[in-house]
């Protein structure tokens, strides 16, 4: 009678500090009454200790109660460890069980052990346990066999997984769910749907789990029609109010760009889980609709659901995509007001948002308060500086990251190498290459492409070619980099040869490849070849030229003095006829060839279309200056002064002692600026006097 009361008390306990105190009292009472041999009480005590996360006390019960001859207790301990992802402990207990002379594993033992081997990736030992299961005669047990299916899926041994499943003499809905879920979780969404179809055709009725996984597979594959078909089955079989099924439907319709249907399903949900709210928000994130995301967040808070870090990160992503600073600041304010302990991903999302909205100072403030012992926070700063063209700061942040002892990863290296490419900072690039080698990442294809780009743009063609040859599977990007490298360093014929070789390997060039080819023609003055490739873009390669391609052609023709041909190309489309970049390129060619008539016409077009652009007035000034029309040139300068327009100062840089030092024209921010300018004046004097 006392035993039943104690068991009833243990079953009432939940995961709380108060419950833990009660459990300890019951535990003490069990010992006082001498009930150490009561198997049911012992099992219940182990289970409630695991529920309260008191693993040590659970182990203490196992070690000190006199009932280890019963496999029931061994299974309870292993199950507790397995449910809490303490897989090493699970296997340690199993090893002791195998060495126990008075107890042997049963069908309830193996699922926990199999799960542990799968989670730890112990393929060899997993196969051994499979053999032991067969020898023990439990391979026909539905739960044990389902566990083996899951284990092989974790090892990515899908054929073995299916073989075990197909050999099962008896299956139930749970075993079908196991195999379907395993394939879905391992990235095999198509196979998961195929198995779902087999399950139905075998006469098994899908339950909530089956339908949720099948809908999630449709979501991953963006297979809207199949998703709608499963939705109809959900309604027909009475699952239209199921929380998990509806959350999956909201996610599927959102990803398939059917937001109205997603919203309709969402509105009908009697109880909206956090997963459902997040799924609805993610649908609007994909469209960059930050306004709708913020509206859903407000409604979510009103209805009593606390946003998670995933919720906030998703909304910030929408704000970044739409460049909506106001909504982004609202989310940032919510994080501060709610005393939300923002994780690394929320802060990284804020940094990305502020950079995209042109608020670098705010991004730097967030970074200063962000966790800095992981690579993610540094990576977002480096990539953000790259995105706004501040190569110097990107390299500077990388140096800071290394100096504080944070180990760069693949993302770090692929982010910082383009900065070295743009700055032609070869020595810095070599230093980073050495770090990549030390990190044993030199075989990573993304890094090989980034290194190839860096060496080619820094003029080290020999090393670029070595890396190019080391890439096992050359894609369009790697070929394009080599074409660009040869073209920009005085070897246009080699560039065109590489272009032909690329096509022989069956690779179709893209717009960037053709841009590299046109650039190579431009550097070498290969006018006719350039015109041929430009005309073939649509007809042969099916590529629509963009502004950069037009700019290349204008430059090629402009250098050759074929200015009217260049002007005719600009006039071909409305998009190109008034484009500032194209007109400026042609205008520079007019200045070079002293073609004042066409140059004056283009300059007036630029001033008319871009009246607030200082560079427009500078090109006009240069035209008048080249023709010695000094009065007209002075009027342009006066106009610029009246409008408050200033030419952007020129920028130069130099590598010194593994550092990239940069400086601007008329820059006086350096502490020793006066000494620098005195030295420059002295050098200029010597040069003018011929000394």
Swiss-Prot record:
Belongs to the PPR family. PCMP-E subfamily. This is Pentatricopeptide repeat-containing protein At5g27110. It comes from Arabidopsis thaliana (Mouse-ear cress). Pfam families: E_motif, PPR, PPR_2. Residues 658-688 are annotated as: Type E(+) motif. PROSITE patterns: PPR. The gene is PCMP-E14. Residues 582-657 are annotated as: Type E motif. It comes from the Eukaryota. The lineage of its organism: Eukaryota, Viridiplantae, Streptophyta, Embryophyta, Tracheophyta. GO terms for molecular function: RNA binding. PPR repeats lie at residues 38-68, 70-104, 106-140, 141-171, 172-206, 207-241, 242-272, 273-307, 308-342, 343-373, 374-408, 409-443, 444-474, 475-509, 510-540, 546-576. Gene3D superfamilies: Tetratricopeptide repeat domain. GO terms for biological process: RNA modification. Keywords: Repeat.
């Amino acid at each position: 009678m006392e035993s039943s009361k104690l068991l009833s008390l243990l079953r009432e306990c939940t995961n709380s500090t108060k419950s833990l105190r009660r459990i300890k009292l019951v535990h003490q009472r069990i010992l006082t009454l001498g009930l150490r041999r009561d198997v049911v009480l012992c099992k219940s005590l182990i289970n409630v200790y695991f529920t309260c996360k008191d693993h040590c006390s659970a182990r203490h019960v196992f070690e000190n109660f006199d009932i280890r001859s019963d496999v029931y207790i061994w299974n309870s301990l292993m199950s507790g460890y397995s449910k809490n992802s303490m897989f090493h402990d699970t296997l340690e207990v199993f090893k002791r069980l195998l060495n126990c002379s008075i107890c042997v594993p049963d069908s309830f033992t193996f699922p926990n052990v199999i799960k542990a081997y799968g989670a730890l990736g112990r393929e060899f030992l997993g196969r051994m346990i499979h053999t032991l299961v067969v020898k023990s005669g439990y391979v026909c047990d539905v739960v044990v066999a389902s566990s083996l299916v899951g284990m092989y899926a974790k090892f990515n041994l899908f054929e073995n997984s299916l073989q075990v499943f197909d050999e099962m003499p008896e299956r139930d809905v749970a075993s079908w769910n196991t195999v379907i879920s395993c394939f879905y979780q391992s990235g095999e969404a198509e196979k998961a749907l195929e198995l779902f179809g087999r399950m139905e055709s075998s006469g098994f009725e899908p339950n909530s789990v089956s339908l949720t996984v099948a809908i999630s597979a449709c979501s991953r594959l963006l297979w809207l029609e199949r998703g709608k078909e499963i939705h109809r089955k959900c309604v027909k079989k009475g699952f239209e109010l199921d929380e998990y099924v509806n959350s999956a439907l909201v996610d599927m319709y959102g990803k398939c760009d059917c937001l109205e249907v997603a919203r309709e399903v969402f509105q009908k949900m009697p109880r909206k889980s956090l997963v459902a709210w997040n799924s609805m928000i993610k649908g609007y994130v994909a469209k960059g609709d930050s306004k709708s995301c913020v509206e859903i967040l407000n409604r979510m808070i009103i209805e009593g659901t606390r946003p998670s870090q995933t919720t906030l990160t998703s909304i910030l992503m929408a704000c970044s995509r739409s460049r909506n600073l106001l909504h982004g600041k609202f989310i940032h304010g919510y994080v501060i007001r709610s005393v939300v302990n923002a994780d690394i991903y929320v802060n990284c999302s804020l940094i990305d948002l502020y950079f995209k909205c042109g608020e670098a100072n705010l991004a730097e403030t967030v970074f200063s308060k962000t966790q800095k012992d992981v690579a993610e926070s540094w990576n977002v700063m480096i990539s953000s500086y790259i995105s706004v063209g501040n190569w110097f700061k990107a390299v500077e942040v990388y140096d800071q990251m290394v100096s504080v002892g944070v180990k760069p990863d693949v993302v770090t290296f692929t982010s910082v190498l383009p900065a070295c490419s743009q700055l032609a900072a070869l020595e810095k690039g070599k230093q980073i290459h050495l770090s990549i080698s030390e990190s044993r990442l030199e075989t990573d294809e993304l890094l090989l492409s980034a290194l190839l780009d860096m060496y080619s743009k820094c003029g080290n063609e020999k090393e670029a070619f070595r890396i190019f040859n080391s890439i096992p599977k050359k894609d369009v990007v790697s070929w394009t980099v080599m074409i660009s490298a040869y073209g920009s360093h005085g070897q246009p014929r080699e560039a065109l040869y590489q272009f032909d070789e690329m096509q022989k390997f069956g690779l179709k060039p893209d717009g960037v490849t053709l841009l590299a080819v046109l650039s190579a023609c431009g550097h070498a003055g290969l006018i006719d070849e350039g015109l041929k490739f430009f005309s073939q873009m649509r007809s042969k390669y099916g590529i629509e030229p963009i502004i950069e391609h037009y700019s290349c052609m204008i430059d090629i023709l402009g250098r050759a003095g074929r200015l009217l041909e260049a002007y005719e190309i600009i006039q071909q489309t409305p998009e190109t006829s008034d484009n500032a970049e194209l007109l400026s390129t042609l205008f520079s060619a007019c200045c070079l060839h002293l073609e004042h008539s066409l140059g004056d016409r283009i300059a007036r077009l630029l001033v008319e279309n871009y009246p607030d652009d200082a560079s427009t007035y500078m090109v006009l000034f240069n035209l008048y200056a080249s023709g010695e029309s000094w009065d007209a040139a002075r009027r342009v300068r006066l106009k610029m002064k009246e409008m408050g327009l200033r030419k952007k100062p020129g920028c130069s840089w130099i590598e010194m002692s593994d550092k990239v030092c940069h400086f601007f024209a008329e820059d006086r921010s350096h502490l020793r600026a006066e000494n620098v300018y005195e030295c420059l004046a002295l050098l200029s004097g010597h040069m003018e006097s011929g000394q």
